[in-house]
Amino acid sequence: ARDSVRDCDANRQLRDGIAELVVESLEDIRDRGMLAMSFLAVLPNEQDGLKEFYQPICIAAVNAFREKPLTPTRSGSHAPASKLYRGPSKICAVLADDDLSLFTEQTPPLWAANPPQQNQREDLFLKSLRIKPWGWSELSEALDCYFDQDQRNRIETWVSQKTDAWMTSFYALLGEGFEKDELSIFCHDRMKIKWIRVVCQNNDTHVLPTEAFLPPDEMTSFPDDIKFVKPSVYE
């Protein structure tokens, strides 16, 4: 039992050797395809209440995950935890690594994989890695382009390259954010971004939210002088 191990020089040397072995083994475990999210459940976390004697093993494991490409990512690869972000599953489901790269100016992979349940062992170990959060408040800040024309242009170019199906998911995400007060009203008032996709004969066109109208249900043809939201982005 752990409690029966004496804190002496010989045992400290053995403990330090175990810590080194754990770190050395992690890359081999990853290369064998076994370093999945479920594996994190077997690693020590802060709620285990381990005695100070065993802390070097925990610290070595955490440092390895932060500094080496060991942390499972949403894209299926592994990356240093220090270079990753964690966010709500609903945001991660809409914004891929390349999308997050636009807002963070960092190189993918960027999203850490999310555990199946919060506050379980996998989640507790991920919390110990101090992965940077990127959630609703960060999204709200990223979309506030009132004083940043360059960022506004980048977002408008980004939106113009998206499919109608993706735009539907993105609008739904924003709608939920505002409905649940996750995105600030302040942000809403300052979103001067042309990202509402409207009906156009040739190419997708985007306008400010205040410039677009939802068409009546029975409308099948659209006049050129009124900017109607493209039905395929909200139906």
Language model: regions and residue ranges:
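GHKL/Bergerat-fold ATPase module
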Residues: A1-E235
